[in-house]
Amino acid sequence: MDYVYCGTDPIGASEDILSVYDAGSAPGNGHFSPSFNGFNIGTTDPEYVELVPVLADGGEHFGVSSVAFDDYEELLWMGNQGGHVTSYYTNSMQKYTSFQVHATDIVRDISTLDSGVLALTQTSLRHQIRRGLPKFTFKSNNMKEMVSMLQLSPHRLVMAGLQDELIDFDLRTLKETRIEHVGAGGCTVLRKNSRYLFAGDQLGTVTLRDLNSLSVQHTIKTHTNILSDFSVQGNLLISCGYSGRQNNLAIDRFLMVYDLRMLRLIAPIQVMIDPQMLKFLPSLTSQLAVVSSYGQVQLVDTVELSEPRVSMYQINTNGSQCLSFDISSSSQAMAFGDQSGHINMIAAVQTPQPQFNLYSRSTEFADVVPQLPMVSITDTNFPLSSVMLPHLTTGTQWFSDWPEELLRYRYHRPKTIDPEVLSNMKMQGPIGYSPNPRTARRNQIPYVIEQGGVCSPNGNGTAAATKAENGVKIIPRRYRKVELKYTKLGTQDFDFDQHNQTCFAGLEATLPNSYCNAMLQILYFTDALRVKLLEHSCIKEFCLSCELGFLFNMLDKSTASSPCQASNFLRSFRTVPEASALGLILTDRSSNVNLISLIQNWNRFILHQMHYEIFDSSKNASTYSGSVQTSTNAENAGSSETSGSSDLYDSISDENSKEDDRERSKINAETDISKIFGTKQICINRCIKCQEEKIKESILLACNLSYPNHIKDSDQYFNFGTILKRSLSSEKSIQAFCERCKKFSPTNQSVKVTSLPQILSINCGLNNEKDITFLKRQLNRCSEKTTVDAAASLSTSKPCRYGANCSRSDCHFMHPDRKSPSHTSQPNAVNNSPNGRQKSWFPLTFTMGINDQGEVQVQTQSDASSGKSEQEEETEKPPTKGLDNNRMYALHAVVCQVDDGTQKNLVSLINVQRPYHTMKLAESADDPQSQWYIFNDFSISPVSPQESVWFTLDWKVPCILFYRHVEDDSESASTTSSTVTESEETIPSESSSGSPTNLSNPFLEEIVSPMLGNLSADATLQPLQSDEMPQSGDLVAMDAEFVTLNPEENEIRPDGKTATIKPCHMSVARISCIRGQGPAEGVPFMDDYISTQEKVVDYLTQFSGIKPGDLDANFSKKRLTALKYSYQKLKYLVDVGVIFVGHGLKNDFRVINIYVPSEQIIDTVHLFHMPHHRMVSLRFLAWHFLGTKIQSETHDSIEDARTTLQLYKHYLKLQEEKKFANALKNLYERGKQLQWKVPED
């Protein structure tokens, strides 16, 4: 037997407090070891045996803070420090239910009821049924730091904690019935008997309270310092806690025993462990279980104190602290929860299969799923009828049974006989025969399209709304979704020029939420907006306006062969909470997305977001003096005849709280966005009973088309102007609260337009069948006359005698596989009728103004779709007498949804103005003023103006329309040209010696306001000083490291090769730049670790040197900064004209999402490359030419950048000595010998 000291007093051990255990042959080391392996450490035969421990749910992250046996069923409940609750069935610890009760709070206590389980956290009380469904969650201002709870009756519960309130809670009404003040010490332990409620605080005091009134009856002082736990059984109250010893706080080895009859302290009980928790065994009234924080358990008998036997056990807590324990009502099992996340259970020796309760009810489990017969997937003879349907409980047939009228036999439609065959047919009895006119091909059956759809023959197949045999719709190639094919070199082998023959740069659609590419192109080609966003700059980290400016700068400089990515914009977009609330952020698992509603909501969101961001960045400037409120789409939707539920509760009172006034002051100011897209309106609410009138001004950024709901005549025609007018201004009756009447009263609400915008943004709606049916009817009315004319022209043509075999290209007769002879095809013409003319319901131009009565008047061109050019239509303005603020609007851009039967995508058709062509191509003044293009991600093609207003509503549906004020073109042209001139002056030439003064220098700002952070890891970093700012032509060596956000997705082809479906999504983690010349050559001046809020799948530590936690602002010791600020530094270096030296810089700049001209890049991977041979790694180049070994364990971007600079200097030396060719040859020969691996020695 060894006697070792088990106390926590490090200064000295009391001689009369010893711990005894049988150590066997192991020598005593003088202190308790938590990793002790023995279970029974007592002197007698064990009364309990240890069962197999289990790792609780979330145990790898959180400890088990509470365990409780169910009083009604054979279940053990567990709550952890992460707010998660799990139940286990019987001693086999089979998981039964698992659910989250709070996102972050610790589960402090668990109690079971007949109807479920109660889980108490720091600030809430959750009630859930045992199957995991929540019943209620109660929160109160009085619940600040709850610790324990106790059920006094089936419908009464008391809760307390480290606060001065004790809460009496009614489980039936879910209300607090009484609040008792318990003092500053709070109440951490609650117990009860038949007379009192015992409440123990952390100062060592136990208060005896009345069970009904909760008033204080008696007070007992247990320990001198802190009360740890106590238990009540019969007339005894036994406690454990902390006492002062030698001016230190130590665990008291004596259990204080109080007789509740006399309220006096009797003889204490000495234990051999450090008691932390204790509890009476329910079935044995005199036996007590005492538990230490190390997992030691001692069973103490309060009656037979003179008995020499010691019953002690050691629970395997994996070297961690024991946090909770509980005893079953049958005393056959005990459960312990520790900090390592494990649950240990011990069972009585007499009952190795313990029962938690003597009389437990059965636990409800899920119904067993019936097993279906196993059938081979290749068995084509298996009858499906052998799988029996469930028995019908009611009725005689299933709801899925088809009605009898749909079960008739329908045969294939017979092929119609050519009238020419019938006219030449001769009869011989019942049989007729005729010579073959050869006007039709073999094995063809005509398919007659049902009437009611908008479909007409078209020369280039644009109007073909039919479907192929496999169900895929036949649509033009330029509208189809183009899949980007990846190889082992990424997108370097992909020919983008095949899909883009223009001078414009496209956008890749490989990242999530790339559905907005169509809208991004429209915003870019809106000249006034592009100019404002290129000038915008603010200090907000995730500013969408700044990111749009960066993206527009890339689109200005990129070409068709180098499409851009909106990765940085989408990264900031995912962080905006409003975008997530509107459902605009999609994941890879998103399916069946309504793209029409999605892109319209995105249009409304981005306009309002830019408005708020530009206002925040310029709030110190002059503000708009009027009281203007930027309205949302819900306000514009109020112009519809169908008012939402919110309209019933509109109030005509303008009294608002101070918080609303502060919020309105933010959106009332006029910004550059509201000047471009804003339509000023006034909303007049007039109470019908008291004639009280309230007027509210607002600005509408996006207009929703409001279609009629109830039409008396189905053939009634509504033109576009009528629909637009009723959408902008309306009058209706609603139920609203009147302040004068003090009740809801009928109210007339009218909306009027007071000012027109420069750019009119229109959401077309069409997200339901009702609106689509209405628009189809209007489109059919427009095409009726054209269809009649086409039929007349076709009837006058005579069929060719040679039919399909005719080889003459100038034949004037009709052929079954050719157009009519009067048709003249044009390369990009989109014709909806044989004579090359189309009429559309959507006009290319219209005139809108405000008359003397303040009403909006919209006049559309009667020949808007008559085939005239857009320039001719704009010059022929209709008479607009009597109109104020009269403006001519021309269609600027359209967003369409394209559905080919297998997938849907969004495309945009944009009228690119002449100033942009001049900027890109430097065209002469004699060139056309504008040209229409279709933008389908990186596929861009020119189209005719008619195609922008041509829709089938089958596979091509309009989503958003943008109309521009025609008279603003001159202003836009001058603004754009001046912007181009400024941008050209901003980029210095190679001969310039100084940096431009009109560029914002972030390096100077860093000198004035140095970045805060831990610079211990950046001892070699020396920021740029004011006298060493980079100039045009200066060398800067750069390297970047990346982490993976989404892994790569591959598939195995039938030939066994692996194909990349989706590339991995990389994010920049570290950017390092070093000086390339001067006295400080090779010294880094920029070494930024990029903070990220997104989940990182793989840190790629072996290749990047980035470790978990380096990018987290809460734990990182690195020089963390936001991506936007590092991006601004790189952008400044690019604009100044520095030359970057690096290894694989093209991929680095692609992930960083910045465009760098090729003449500003020196890439060592290409310098030391022999044509038609492999690329050489930086590590091998450094070893071969410089004799240094790098990247031995992990990569370091500063080391890599410095190495590339040295390699470039060595390259210049070899070129000067004319030894480079031989050196390159030796490099590849040596690499092949060593298999391109650096030797270890």
Swiss-Prot record:
UniProt GO cellular component terms: nucleus; P-body; PAN complex
Chain segments carrying region Linker: 359-473
Domain Exonuclease: 1036-1208
Cofactor dependence: a divalent metal cation
Residues the entry annotates as binding a divalent metal cation: 1039, 1041, 1148, 1200
PROSITE patterns: USP_3
Domain (USP) ranges: 474-966
Cofactor binding note of this UniProt entry: Binds 2 metal cations per subunit in the catalytic exonuclease domain.
EC number of the protein: 3.1.13.4
Biased composition (Low complexity): 972-981
Reaction(s) this enzyme catalyzes, per UniProt: Exonucleolytic cleavage of poly(A) to 5'-AMP
HAMAP family: PAN2
Name of this protein: PAN2-PAN3 deadenylation complex catalytic subunit PAN2
Gene: PAN2
